[in-house]
Amino acid sequence: MAQAFPASTFTGSDYHEGSVTEAAKRASEAGVADRASFEVAGAQSFSGTGHALVTSFDCLHDMGDPLGAARHVRSTLAADGTWLIVEPIAGDTIESNLNPVGRAYYAFSTFLCTPSSLSQDVGLALGAQAGEKRIHDVVTAAGFTRFRRIGETAFNAVYEARP
């Protein structure tokens, strides 16, 4: 993104220090370190305010407190800002997820996503097959007034949330 939008600045956040170190190294190698910085921070503590765009990729369903994270995102966005949310594609019912991708995601979720969430504070445990309705409910409970699916692949749904 820093290469595609050279007039913008970017801050990447992750709670895993090794990932942050690697991201900073790659930004330097790509020649964008002057406009891309990285910090060790969780979804409820990343820095900044007035963001035009906040992104989250395949992580909301793994969080122990996705509502707390959504509230923090909301508090850091500009009044006309956008939260871009990428999550595993899922229907809202078990029956709608009984397909090859859904079955694989249920398996991953059983061994990774759900235990990860349960090990954290709150432990909501949305899991990889949360579905659009559950994501919508979290986002709107956090104070967002607009939520819509703006894209999808065979594996992911892409949502836009706005204040």
Locate each region found by the language model.
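Core SAM-dependent methyltransferase catalytic element
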Residues: 142-163
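Conserved SAM-binding motif I beta-strand of class I
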Residues: 9-14
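Conserved SAM/SAH-binding beta-strand->alpha-helix loop
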Residues: 16-18
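A short SAM/SAH-binding and catalytic strip from SAM-dependent methyltransferases
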Residues: 52-67
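C-terminal alpha-helical "lid/dimerization" subdomain adjacent to the S-adenosyl-L-methionine
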Residues: 86-142
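A short glycine-rich, Lys/Arg-flanked "PGG" loop and its adjoining helix->strand segment in the class I
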Residues: 67-79
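A short acidic, Gly/Pro-enriched loop at the edge of an enzyme's catalytic core
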Residues: 41-54
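Conserved SAM-binding strand-loop segment of SAM-dependent methyltransferases
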Residues: 30-43
